[in-house]
Regions:
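Non-catalytic N-terminal targeting/anchoring module and adjacent flexible stem/linker
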Residues: 246-307
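Catalytic machinery of carbohydrate-active enzymes
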Residues: 1-268, 294
């Protein structure tokens, strides 16, 4: 059987969902997974057991649902058997469970929706094939030698970035920015991260990778950039950095109203919902209303890295 997955972006969400796909793969199913092309380099070799189908992004947002459904048709995937892992698709509310938005965090929701035990989220190591040569090449590019002292930083998320306050680091500790585009695959950074004294990350794909891989070695510092329900459940021992960003965001979804929508018949026309068939703009077809940071990240926590 072929199993399609609807989670075309972002990279952090794809990493969160990989153990879900692996659970179905181990049942003997073929996984067909359309993703936005900018993430393809990270997974095409490291996760070769998935049939990845890279897609171009567009202003209409067709890569959320319309393009994946076309890809499923081409690959003979039954859309009714696909895993729809977005937290919320506002033009297709029948695909989600809005009643659970106030109960589960977004990563818990993906596992609940797919019927996979949440504890498997932290088995990412079993889902990927590391490339030691690529990891060594990256160390060489960065000029890292045995015994070098360094910390890694990742201060960019999908809709958030912060400057690195270098003055708060021990001057003897070199800062290496994981956000620099030095390699096609995020997994090539694993060796560098494992050798670091510390890793300082905003909530991002890099932080998700470190957490889900159970990276041991660096001290871990995590910076929230979203309201509580849109942050992942962390499994490693992180120091959570306080910020003045709001804990709660205005309600994005009215569960009662969405339950009514879901109860209404949603005709499917050639693999598309009625809303799609009507040619509506899908640019707002997102998993949630994007959070816009209203505060700023304090920098005093950086003193924790001083010797």
């Amino acid at each position: 059987m072929k199993r399609g997955i609807i989670q075309s972006r972002g990279l952090g969400d794809i990493l969160i969902a990989l153990p879900i796909a692996r659970a179905y793969y181990e049942r003997g199913e073929e996984i067909v997974w359309p993703i936005c092309e900018e993430f393809y380099g990270s997974v095409k070799d490291s996760v070769a057991w998935v049939t990845w189908v890279p897609m171009k992004t567009d202003d209409r947002g067709s890569f959320f649902l319309e393009q994946p459904l076309k890809i499923f048709k081409y690959h003979d995937v039954d859309p009714n058997q696909a895993l729809y892992l977005y937290h919320y698709l506002n033009v297709a509310p029948e695909l989600t469970e809005p009643e659970l938005f106030n109960i589960l965090k977004f990563d818990q929701y993906k596992y609940w929706k797919s019927g996979v035990p949440f504890v498997l989220k932290w088995t990412l190591e079993l889902c990927i094939t590391r490339d030691p040569a690529a990891e060594d090449s990256l160390r060489s590019t960065l000029g890292i030698k045995q015994g070098d002292r360094y910390a890694v930083v990742s201060m960019k998320g999908s809709n958030f970035s912060a400057a690195v306050p270098q003055g708060f680091f021990d001057p003897n500790v070199r800062l290496i920015n994981v956000d620099d585009n030095l390699t096609d695959s995020i997994f090539d950074w694993l060796g560098v991260i494992e050798g670091a004294e510390a890793a300082v990350c905003v909530d991002s794909a890099v932080a998700n990778m470190i957490d889900q891989m159970g990276v041991v070695g660096p001290k871990l510092y995590w910076i929230r950039r979203s309201p509580w329900d849109l942050t992942p459940v962390l499994g490693s021992t992180w120091t959570i950095i306080p910020t003045n960003l709001p804990i709660k965001d205005p309600v994005r979804v009215d569960p009662a109203a969405e339950a009514v929508k879901k109860a209404q018949p949603q005709p499917v026309l050639q693999g598309r919902t009625a809303a799609q068939a009507n040619g509506g703009d899908q640019s707002s077809l997102t998993s949630h209303v994007p959070f816009k940071a209203a505060g700023k990240i304090p920098t005093s926590f950086m003193s924790a890295l001083k010797k």
